[in-house]
Amino acid sequence: MMQSREEIRDDSSSGLVLTTDPKPRLRWTTELHERFVDAVTHLGGPEKATPKTIMRVMGVKGLTLYHLKSHLQKFRLGKQPHKEHSQNHSICIRDTNRASMLDLRRNAVFTTSPLIIGRNMNEMQMEVQRRIEEEVVIERQVNQRIAAQGKYMESMLEKACETQEASLTKDYSTLFFDRTNICNNTSSIPIPWFEDHFPSSSSMDSTLILPDINSNFSLQDSRSSITKGRTVCLG
């Protein structure tokens, strides 16, 4: 009875291998797994593919959703021996390629001629010299701009001082002229009270009349006669 369970039914047309158990188990051969991988890739990867779509794309008779569901889960988890083998193979290839690249680089370093090294050194020196010259030019331009700005500020300050000085001189001249006019005007202003009590020189000259000499003598004669009369009466 155990021997009957181990019997295998092979369908060469579809590549499907099933056991003769009451629940036949599918043997995933390399050819069948490759068809499965092609179908999954065609459907957009293991995350997008479903057992139903995989079965439709593969088109293998006798393949059930149960078989595909189990195999898809293992494929997603990365537990298939075929996938592990392919991954290991790709890792080995990458390691080999990496080692080959390292060897090529080492050989290139050791086999580099002194002429190439000297040329690289000359190019580096020329690049450094070029950058130094650019920095010198930039520094010179900055200094020129600073000097020009300083001269501009100095000229603006001088103009401001000249304008202020001219304004002060004009104000002083105007003030002096106004004071002179005020003094001249006040000297010619008449004072009513003074003129009322003190006549002017012209009026004083006209009213002041000196007496004649003859009148003075007559006045003296009258005074002397009066004095004589008084003495006679008293005697």
UniProtKB/Swiss-Prot annotation:
Cysteine pairs bridged by disulfides in the record: none
Region (Disordered): 1-20
Coiled coil start-end: none
InterPro entries in the cross-refs: Homeodomain-like_sf, Myb_CC_LHEQLE, Myb_dom, Myb_dom_plants, PHR1-like, SANT/Myb
Source species: Arabidopsis thaliana (Mouse-ear cress)
Gene that encodes the chain: PHL12
Keyword line: Coiled coil, DNA-binding, Nucleus, Transcription, Transcription regulation
Pfam families named in the record: Myb_CC_LHEQLE, Myb_DNA-binding
Name under which the protein is recorded: Myb family transcription factor PHL12
The keyword Transmembrane is assigned to this record: no
